[in-house]
């Protein structure tokens, strides 16, 4: 079979991702475009004659980049197409918004690359009484047009057949440009490298006349002639860019008049009715908060019910199983304990996180595909405008509820560097899925019936601190106003189940692989340092270990936030949590249960793997039946109490070490707000610079330490009033000094993003091998 590389391109909300998932299924690979942290997805599928590599390009309305502030999505899509890596393009067009979508289609066809138009969302168009003559549209465009309903899989086989049959577009004159424009486009084309096809050279000439800054990188010496061409055109027309766009829109209007009845179409009544409530200025925000709480309830409640299968199952296989092998093969006791506690304990920490994190990713995917996520940005626009940000900057922040890394990367959709940078600085404060795992364990141990309220308050606190960080930046080092907010609100529709599952699986797989590697390595590392003293001798009590000795020296620093000297395990959790937040649970689990594993004798004769696995299945089934009872729905934290090791020995030790719910909540505040994990730090550095990464770390540490100290000292003021008063005053004075220094430093701060300084044309024009 012949190999074929196809680029999948289309407007945002045109159903491009759903079509990508329909074609490729689980055969996907996610990486980054070379040089920038913009996600690049590739998938594989086969037609009758070809083995196809499908590249999912970022959604864009146009290939024209007017300024360097244009979002990176448009730049990358444009440069991939110009690179010539794609043998064929599939342009996904929303049939219910044909006129707007055809602008990108005309640009692609003018470029001369073989193209197939995938006319998607025909079901929505039919509901709006939109009728499109597919054959007439294909004739007018000069390329195949395949009708699709990607959410239901309709038209997929016809699309594959079109891929096998299509070689080149018909030579159809689409747009009638004014003669002066064609003259100058030919003048510029003659100065370009002659090995480039004439059609592509002429297209680049028109793009340059329209003001596209990145087409100059491909124009060679012709870029030097641009000023001459513009000077000649100035005598004949007012604005060449306006004339080019007007010619294209006239062509689009003529096509739509012939092939469709879009002028008499009826907008979706359901969408209009729901939006009257969802977008209401008074109801919009409460509804958004309710949706966020629903996401939290789903993750805790249903995810927690599935935990026994992953928790008890992993204990049976990776802890008791390793102990059984060790005793059966007569391993030394220290080696058996080391493997069970380090390797087995690490795996046992990762797997119980899967159901809760998976349910959260599923809910986020549902919100994105249903059309609500765009509404959330619209609802939050007024608040974001107060920060000097457009409403769409809240979309990356919402994604942060799943993971902060795509939240930071999502800032690329914003146009202005200042807006991108402010959003990047706010993103780490959004409570990610890994933090949810920590909150659920502490809530079950300390807060009882108030657990749901405690966890939800931490989510709200993260949003509040992100907003306050934005206000601080606006009034100190990043003064400015938000750019005008124009955002398309897609029609509501039921998400496609296959697409939801694939998106959830891709995110969950990335989380488990990333978290698993770190947690297992950290667990083994901690087990080693927990087994030996500073002198290198094996210890019987972990309080005599090297890890305990070093941690006791550092722990007094955290006394103001309620971490006492004998609770050195909590200090270790904060340091390992900087690598990945989910490691905090693994660290506390490893350290708090270490003595139990050492003291409890294991009898290999009593171990039966099948019985333990059946017990895990029975516990899970019982949890699922109990999940939907009224008592559990009223208090979803109950679903997370069956958390294996953490639910028994570790929770008892943890309760004793912290001493109070106030100290535990203060610790959670610090975990929520302090340094981002290593992956987020790397994303911040690549999307901005190392300097801004350092600022994010220091600001997060300050906010976390200050707020946790204030909370704990206020709640425990009666126990030590003098000490509490000193701590509170010290925090206030320090932050006043910090804010004063930031106000003075604003004139010396460079807010230009590292990503915008990179030569995107060079880094995005490579082959698929550059996806890493």
Swiss-Prot record:
Binding site for GTP: 120-123, 149-151
Main location (coarse class): membrane
Residues where GTP 1 binds: 10-17
Residues where GTP 2 binds: 35-39
Matching Gene3D superfamilies: 1.10.287.1770, P-loop containing nucleotide triphosphate hydrolases
Induction: Iron uptake is repressed by the global regulator Fur.
PROSITE patterns: G_FEOB
Keywords: Cell inner membrane, Cell membrane, GTP-binding, Ion transport, Iron, Iron transport, Membrane, Nucleotide-binding, Transmembrane, Transmembrane helix, Transport
Location(s) in or outside the cell: Cell inner membrane
Note: Acquisition of Mn(2+) in addition to Fe(2+) is required for intercellular survival, replication in macrophages in vitro and for full virulence in vivo.
NCBIfam families named in the record: feoB, PRK09554.1, small_GTP
Record's protein name: Fe(2+) transporter FeoB
């Amino acid at each position: 079979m012949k190999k074929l590389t196809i680029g999948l391109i289309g407007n945002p909300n045109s159903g491009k991702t759903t079509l990508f998932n329909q074609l490729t299924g689980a055969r996907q690979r996610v990486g980054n475009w070379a040089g920038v942290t913009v996600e690049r997805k590739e998938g594989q599928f086969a037609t009758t004659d070809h083995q196809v590599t499908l590249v999912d390009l970022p959604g864009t309305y146009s290939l024209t980049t007017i300024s360097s502030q244009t979002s990176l999505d448009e730049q990358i899509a444009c440069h991939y197409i110009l690179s010539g890596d794609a043998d064929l393009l599939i342009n996904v067009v929303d049939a219910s918004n044909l006129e707007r979508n055809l602008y990108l289609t005309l640009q692609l066809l003018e470029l001369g690359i073989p193209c197939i138009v995938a006319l998607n969302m025909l079901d929505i168009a039919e509901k709006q009484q939109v009728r499109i003559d597919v054959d007439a549209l294909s004739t007018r465009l000069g390329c195949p047009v395949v009708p699709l309903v990607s959410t239901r899989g309709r038209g997929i086989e016809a699309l594959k057949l079109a891929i096998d049959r299509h070689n080149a577009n018909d030579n159809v004159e689409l747009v009638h440009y004014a003669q002066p424009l064609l003259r100058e486009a030919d003048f510029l084309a003659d100065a370009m490298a002659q090995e480039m096809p004439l059609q592509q050279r002429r297209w680049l000439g028109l793009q340059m006349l329209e003001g596209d800054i990145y087409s100059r990188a491909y124009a060679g010496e012709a870029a030097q002639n641009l000023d001459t061409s513009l000077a000649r055109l100035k005598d004949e027309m007012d604005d060449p860019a306006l004339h080019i766009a007007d010619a294209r829109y006239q062509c689009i209007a003529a096509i739509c008049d012939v092939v469709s009845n879009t002028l008499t179409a009826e907008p979706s009544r359901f969408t209009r009715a729901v939006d009257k409530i969802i977008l209401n200025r008074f109801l919009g925000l409460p509804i958004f908060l309710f949706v966020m709480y629903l996401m939290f309830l789903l993750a805790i409640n249903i995810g927690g019910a599935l935990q026994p299968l992953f928790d008890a199952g992993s204990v049976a296989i990776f802890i008791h199983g390793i102990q059984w092998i060790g005793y059966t093969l007569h391993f030394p006791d220290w080696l058996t304990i080391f493997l069970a506690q380090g390797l087995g304990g690490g795996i046992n920490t990762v797997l119980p996180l899967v159901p809760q994190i998976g349910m959260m990713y599923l809910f986020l995917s549902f919100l994105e595909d249903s059309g609500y996520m765009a509404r959330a940005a619209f609802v939050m626009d007024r608040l974001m405008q107060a920060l000097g940000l457009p409403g769409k900057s809240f979309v990356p922040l919402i994604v942060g509820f799943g993971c902060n890394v795509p939240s930071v990367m999502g800032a690329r959709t914003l146009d202005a560097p200042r807006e991108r940078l402010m959003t990047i600085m706010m993103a780490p404060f959004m409570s990610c899925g890994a933090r949810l795992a920590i909150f659920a364990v502490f809530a079950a141990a300390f807060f009882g019936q108030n657990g749901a309220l405690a966890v939800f308050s931490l989510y709200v606190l993260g949003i509040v601190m992100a907003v306050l960080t934005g206000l601080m930046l606006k009034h100190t080092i990043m003064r400015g106003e938000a750019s005008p907010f124009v955002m398309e609100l897609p029609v509501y529709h039921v998400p496609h189940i296959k697409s939801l599952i694939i998106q959830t699986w891709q995110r969950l797989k990335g989380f488990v692989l990333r978290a698993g590697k770190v947690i297992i390595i950290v667990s083994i590392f901690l087990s080693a340092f927990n087994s030996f003293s500073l002198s290198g001798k094996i210890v019987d009590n972990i309080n005599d270990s090297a890890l305990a000795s070093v941690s006791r020296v550092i722990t007094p620093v955290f006394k103001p936030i309620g971490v006492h000297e004998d609770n050195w395990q909590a200090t270790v959790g904060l340091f390992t949590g900087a690598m990945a937040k989910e490691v905090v649970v693994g660290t506390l689990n490893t350290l708090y249960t270490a003595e139990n594993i050492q003291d409890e004798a294991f009898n290999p004769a009593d171990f039966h793997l099948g019985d333990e696995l059946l017990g895990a299945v029975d516990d899970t089934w019982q949890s699922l039946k109990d999940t939907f009872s009224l008592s559990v729905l009223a208090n979803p934290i109950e679903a997370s109490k069956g958390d294996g090791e953490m639910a028994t020995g570790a929770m008892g030790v943890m309760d004793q070490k912290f001493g109070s719910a106030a100290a535990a909540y203060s610790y959670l505040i610090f975990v929520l707000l302090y340094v981002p994990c290593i992956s987020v730090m790397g994303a911040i550095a690549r999307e901005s610079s190392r300097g801004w990464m350092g600022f994010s770390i220091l600001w997060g540490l300050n906010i976390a330490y200050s707020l946790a100290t204030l909370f704990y000292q206020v709640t425990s003021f009666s126990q030590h009033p003098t000490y509490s008063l000193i701590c509170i005053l010290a925090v206030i004075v320090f932050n006043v000094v910090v804010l004063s220094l930031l106000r003075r430093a604003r004139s010396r701060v460079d807010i230009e993003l590292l990503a915008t300084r990179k030569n995107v044309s060079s880094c995005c024009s490579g082959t698929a091998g550059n996806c890493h």
